[in-house]
């Protein structure tokens, strides 16, 4: 596991054969994991039953919006008086396997965790790193919630990194949620996406290439101060897409004005934002978020870059503490 050791084991699992054996998600059934699925969990450190032997781990797919969405659910025993369930929404190019440290921290703080791979990411179906419309992300979230509503414990909390944060912003604004109607009691946004950095130039480039290309090569930026994490993404993670899909940028272009013109809502959010983030236009995005939500608590991290969930250890500690403190209120 990249965050535990410098030596990365060669993955003795293969995405296609894992998918062939995936079962529907049902936390009422205790299934034995296949040897290959155990190897996948070990590769990303999702084998958290080693650190937390009392935790039950369930996984499988949910059919949502034409997709088969891979769901991971970690459940504490009743005897530990769990505080509810944290939903984790990952960012663009990410997957649940990169969020193990956050899952670990939530379990340690007494929360169950539910996390799923977005369409086009990880073990979920869909064209890699593509989406037809950001409405698909909303439909998947609402179908996942509907599927698990009677199967997992409340209250619910949510944390989203980057595009995951965008999905939560959209959920709250498009449904005009307030404190009474939202499925989530508390929401934390980590380096949330509204506009990416260099948005004007990106739109011009997109207009030029859209008639000719379906994707362009991904550049792996230094979006974290954790060199081990960056090396893992570039060199060792078999679930990393190597190209940006033009459809995703097309969808983002439609989504940004929709969010920026949305009516404000009476809901509080906590935003954690690195001031060295070169991925999103964070100053603009914070202004938009302040205008949209009744109360916005900001935790700025002066040396923080974009991938806050996988930042250098001291910065990551501040990020995780803010999340847990917000949910524990």
What feature does the model see in each segment?
Residues 267, 281-290:
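Short alpha-helix in the alpha/beta-hydrolase fold that links the catalytic acid
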Residues 304-317:
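Catalytic histidine-centered segment of alpha/beta-hydrolase-like enzymes
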Residues 1-63, 69-76:
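An N-terminal hydrophobic leader/cap segment in hydrolases
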Residues 157-250:
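Alpha/beta-hydrolase-fold enzymes
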Residues 290-307:
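Catalytic histidine neighborhood in serine/cysteine hydrolases
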Residues 92-98, 121-152:
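Catalytic nucleophile-loop/oxyanion-hole region of alpha/beta-hydrolase
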Residues 96, 103-127:
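Conserved alpha/beta-hydrolase
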Residues 265, 271-273, 277:
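Short beta-strand/loop motif that positions the catalytic acidic residue
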């Amino acid at each position: 596991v990249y965050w535990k050791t410098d030596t990365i084991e060669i993955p003795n699992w293969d995405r296609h054969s894992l998918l062939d054996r995936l079962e529907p998600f049902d936390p009422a059934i205790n299934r034995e994991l296949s040897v290959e699925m155990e190897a996948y969990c070990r590769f990303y450190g999702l084998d958290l039953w080693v650190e937390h032997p009392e935790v039950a781990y369930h996984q499988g797919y949910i059919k949502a919006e034409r997709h088969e969405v891979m769901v991971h659910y970690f459940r504490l025993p009743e005897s530990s008086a769990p505080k509810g369930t944290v939903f984790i929404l990952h960012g663009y190019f990410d997957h649940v396997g990169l969020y193990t440290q956050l899952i670990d921290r939530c379990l340690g703080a007494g929360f169950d965790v539910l996390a799923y791979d977005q369409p086009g990411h990880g073990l979920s179906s869909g064209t890699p790193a593509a989406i037809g419309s950001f409405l698909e992300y909303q439909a998947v979230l609402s179908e996942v919630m509907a599927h698990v509503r009677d199967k997992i414990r409340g209250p619910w909390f949510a944390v989203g990194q980057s595009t995951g944060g965008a999905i939560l912003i959209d959920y709250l604004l498009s449904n005009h949620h307030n404190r009474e109607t939202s499925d989530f009691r508390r929401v934390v946004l980590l380096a949330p996406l509204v506009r990416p950095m260099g948005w004007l130039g990106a739109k011009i480039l997109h207009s030029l290439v859209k008639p000719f290309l379906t994707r362009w090569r991904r550049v792996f930026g230094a979006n974290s101060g954790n060199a081990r994490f960056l090396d893992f993404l570039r060199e060792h993670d078999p679930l990393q897409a190597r190209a940006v899909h033009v459809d995703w940028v097309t969808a983002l272009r439609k989504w940004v004005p929709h969010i920026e013109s949305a009516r404000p809502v009476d809901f509080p959010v906590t935003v954690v934002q690195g001031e060295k983030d070169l991925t999103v236009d964070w100053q603009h995005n914070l202004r938009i978020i302040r205008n949209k939500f009744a109360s916005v608590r900001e935790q700025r991290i002066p040396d923080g870059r974009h991938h806050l969930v996988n930042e250098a250890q001291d910065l990551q500690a501040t990020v995780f503490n803010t999340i847990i403190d917000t949910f524990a209120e």
